[in-house]
């Protein structure tokens, strides 16, 4: 029995090493440049004109390593889902019906690049090298205890976050669709990037409509902890 167990462990290890070697043999940078760059900005800077924002096809990726978590990237690249329910630029997806504006869901599609596990790992590895070196690290400890009630009051009543972002509290989902959904932001986003984005949205995207709101470090930290807890 012991030898069977050791043999099984050895086989599992060999399989893992084989997968790692396969992933390392795949050129993630080449895939990003050939498959992603046609829609995503992978070199920067972000658009500085309204026209540039309107022409943006997909979110910028030139700071993906600062923004995302690698495990989420690997999973998402294998099965892309819609994160922005009104599209990257909602004005490009508005239709008028009965005198009212609405979002046309038929024009909003998930990313077409559905990669194998090995390719997803290679692409994620490359994306994680695309970082903003000026972003502070370790600003927020995601394991820190915080008041859920205070955080919910802040994000839903004192600040306009739910006007653009979908939020989830238990089984209840609230909020708008013009911004990226935050219902699983804890899996997707680096807490330090969340904090930095709240602190100065225009640093990351000069023409974003997300407002820069002055607040204390404690409130910004509270928002970051709440958003990071959304899984």
Residue ranges and their predicted role:
Residues 29, 43-76, 90-102, 166-196, ...:
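Gly/Gly-Pro-rich "capping" loops immediately C-terminal to redox-active cysteine motifs
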Residues 33, 38-46, 66, 78-81, ...:
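Detector for the c-type heme attachment site
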Residues 70-78, 82, 120-124, 191-199, ...:
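An amphipathic alpha-helix signature
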Residues 1-4:
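Positively charged n-region of N-terminal signal peptides that target proteins for export
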């Amino acid at each position: 029995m012991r030898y069977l167990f050791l043999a099984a462990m050895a086989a599992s290890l060999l399989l893992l090493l084989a997968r790692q070697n396969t992933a390392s043999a795949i050129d993630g940078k080449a895939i990003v440049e050939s498959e992603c760059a046609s829609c995503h900005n992978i070199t920067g800077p972000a658009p500085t004109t309204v026209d540039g924002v309107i022409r943006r096809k997909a979110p910028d990726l030139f700071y993906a390593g600062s923004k995302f978590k690698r495990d989420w990237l690997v999973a998402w690249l294998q099965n892309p889902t819609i994160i922005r329910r009104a599209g990257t630029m909602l004005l490009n997806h508005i239709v008028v019906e009965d005198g009212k504006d609405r979002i046309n869901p038929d024009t909003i599609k998930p990313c077409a690049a559905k990669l194998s596990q090995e390719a997803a790992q290679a692409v994620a590895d490359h994306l994680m090298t695309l970082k903003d070196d000026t972003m502070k690290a370790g600003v927020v400890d995601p394991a820190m205890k915080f008041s859920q009630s205070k955080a919910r009051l802040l994000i839903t009543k004192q600040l306009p976050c739910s006007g653009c972002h979908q939020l989830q509290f238990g089984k209840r989902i609230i909020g708008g669709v013009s911004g990226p959904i935050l219902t699983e932001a804890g899996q997707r986003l680096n807490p330090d990037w969340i904090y930095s984005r709240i602190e100065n949205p225009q640093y990351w995207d000069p023409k974003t409509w997300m407002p820069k709101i002055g607040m204390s470090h404690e409130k910004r930290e509270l928002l970051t902890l709440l958003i990071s807890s959304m899984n």
